[in-house]
Amino acid sequence: MYKIFFRLVFKRMDPERAHYAAFRWIRLAARIPVLRTFVAAALAPRHKELRTEALGLRMHGPFGLAAGFDKNAIAIDGMAMLGFDHVEIGTVTGEPQPGNPKKRLFRLVADRALINRMGFNNEGSAAVAARLAARNPVFRTTVGVNIGKTKVVPEDEAAADYVKSTERLAAHADYLVVNVSSPNTPGLRNLQATESLRPLLTAVREAADRTVTTRRVPLLVKIAPDLADEDVDAVADLAVELGLDGVIATNTTVAREGLGLKSHPDLVGEAGGLSGAPLKDRSLEVLSRLYARVGDRITLVGVGGVENAEDAWQRILAGATLVQGYSAFIYEGPAYARAIHQGLAARLAASPYATLAEAVGAETRKQAAA
């Protein structure tokens, strides 16, 4: 049903307009008690065998919504209603900013992919913190907050900008993510270099601990798929050294070669980060490499090209405790999370593993032992 609607309506609309139209409908449904109860019963069934403990948190399942869809913490209940067991909001910057000029979001339908150069358009950390503080949750879900650099802030002042966001948002986050991997903010990816990343993550950790004294807010870093293997290793080692709680692999890619893209060259050539199905293999490679390096010492989150339950299962076998999706949600529609959780439950039942936790990293460990 949704795929017919997508072809007849959404495909003909500007992608950003279609995004906000869907966003409004989800928010509206979540505000109507009878409707949200019905939708949640249909799309967010619980599978007790998928219960997950990660980052010191208990979740109904491992699959959640990646950052980028709900930038301003407006539709958390709506996304939980659709079956996402954690919702990562943002990216949120220290100060509000409009993002890059439109047109800035493109669908590569033939590739089941998106290209975006949104540029961290968001209302800023103060506004988002106020919204989170006032939130009265309808559905129990884990809320991650993804923070990034304000565009006008120079690279050498980035740490202070991230600290500002941390001080405002940490108290309202179940976990925090430092995003240094978007290709759409000039200079941001330079912060992935360990000599820049170490002081940045240290400053954010200290700010979170200083701001929230009643609990330890888990801190993760999100990395790009375009890092060289040795740089992936360096980030992994740094994460362990600094006592980070996790790494999210991966963000969008600036690469176009070698991805087998079928869309029109003019569309493929649009500037920005590419997400969706073509990212699948490289994201999985990075995830496996991270797990081989860090094992179970930190939590890994797999994202990038997760279209279905098999993709999510492969992420878990590679080393991900949590898995996220976004681009495929645009193509698959509201039953996306339900299908993944149902498929994961079936795969776990058919596997040799007694629990989901047992399956985490099993394939990577097997390859290492071969």
Swiss-Prot record:
Superkingdom as given in the UniProt entry: Bacteria
Ligand binding (FMN): 67-71, 91, 146, 179, 222, 250, 276, 305, 326-327
Pathway assigned to this chain's UniProt record: Pyrimidine metabolism; UMP biosynthesis via de novo pathway; orotate from (S)-dihydroorotate (quinone route): step 1/1
InterPro entries named in the record: Aldolase_TIM, DHO_dehydrogenase, Dihydroorotate_DH_2, Dihydroorotate_DH_cat, Dihydroorotate_DH_CS
UniProt keyword terms in alphabetical order: Cell membrane, Flavoprotein, FMN, Membrane, Oxidoreductase, Pyrimidine biosynthesis
Protein's membrane topology: Peripheral membrane protein
Pfam family, one: DHO_dh
Active site, renumbered: 182 (nucleophile)
Oxidoreductase is among the record's keywords: yes
Molecular function terms from GO: dihydroorotate dehydrogenase (quinone) activity
Sites where the protein binds substrate: 71, 116-120, 179, 184, 251-252
Function: Catalyzes the conversion of dihydroorotate to orotate with quinone as electron acceptor.
Family, per entry: Belongs to the dihydroorotate dehydrogenase family. Type 2 subfamily.
PANTHER family to which the protein is assigned, alphabetical: DIHYDROOROTATE DEHYDROGENASE (QUINONE), MITOCHONDRIAL (PTHR48109:SF4), DIHYDROOROTATE DEHYDROGENASE (QUINONE), MITOCHONDRIAL-RELATED (PTHR48109)
Protein name in the entry: Dihydroorotate dehydrogenase (quinone)
Source species: Streptomyces griseus subsp. griseus (strain JCM 4626 / CBS 651.72 / NBRC 13350 / KCC S-0626 / ISP 5235)
Gene: pyrD
